[in-house]
Amino acid sequence: MARLAGVDLPREKRLEVALTYIYGVGKTRAHKTLAETGISPDVRVKDLSDAELVQLRDYIEVNYKVEGDLRREVAADIRRKVEIGSYEGIRHRRGLPVRGQRTKTNARTRKGPKRTVAGKKKAGR
């Protein structure tokens, strides 16, 4: 099984798709990586030679921040925003949407399940 950046790539998939299993590598970056290294995007992971695998591993290590390093950097950025008390940091701390989305309705993913609030009693007739 091919391992790149600490991730087992699925053997049966095309290389261009398999590279997107690495955190920090999407479609565009996978396509660019294969173009730069001269490896066909249509080749299956199981058909890769060891030389091509080493070439890919070296290219990704040198040019991109992926997996653990990228996750640490993102977490540090969020932690920094929370510590300095910026608007984004406050939104992170409160578990609300950070990028200006509406919260009167929707935003259930960030806010969690609805909490029912006791309403006013109906007036008796």
Swiss-Prot record:
Cleaved signal peptide residues: none
A biological process term (GO) from this entry: translation
A molecular-function term among this protein's GO annotations: structural constituent of ribosome
GO cellular component terms, A-Z: cytosol; small ribosomal subunit
Region (Disordered) location: 93-125
Keywords carried by this UniProt record: Ribonucleoprotein, Ribosomal protein, RNA-binding, rRNA-binding, tRNA-binding
Keyword RNA-binding: yes
Gene3D superfamilies (alphabetical): 1.10.8.50, 30s ribosomal protein s13, domain 2
InterPro entries referenced in this protein's UniProt entry, alphabetically: Rbsml_uS13_C, Ribosomal_uS13, Ribosomal_uS13-like_H2TH, Ribosomal_uS13_bac-type, Ribosomal_uS13_CS
Source organism, top-level taxon: Bacteria
Summary of subunit composition and partner proteins: Part of the 30S ribosomal subunit. Forms a loose heterodimer with protein S19. Forms two bridges to the 50S subunit in the 70S ribosome.
PANTHER family xref list: 30S RIBOSOMAL PROTEIN S13/40S RIBOSOMAL PROTEIN S18, SMALL RIBOSOMAL SUBUNIT PROTEIN US13M
Function (record text): Located at the top of the head of the 30S subunit, it contacts several helices of the 16S rRNA. In the 70S ribosome it contacts the 23S rRNA (bridge B1a) and protein L5 of the 50S subunit (bridge B1b), connecting the 2 subunits; these bridges are implicated in subunit movement. Contacts the tRNAs in the A and P-sites.
Protein name listed in UniProt: Small ribosomal subunit protein uS13
Gene: rpsM
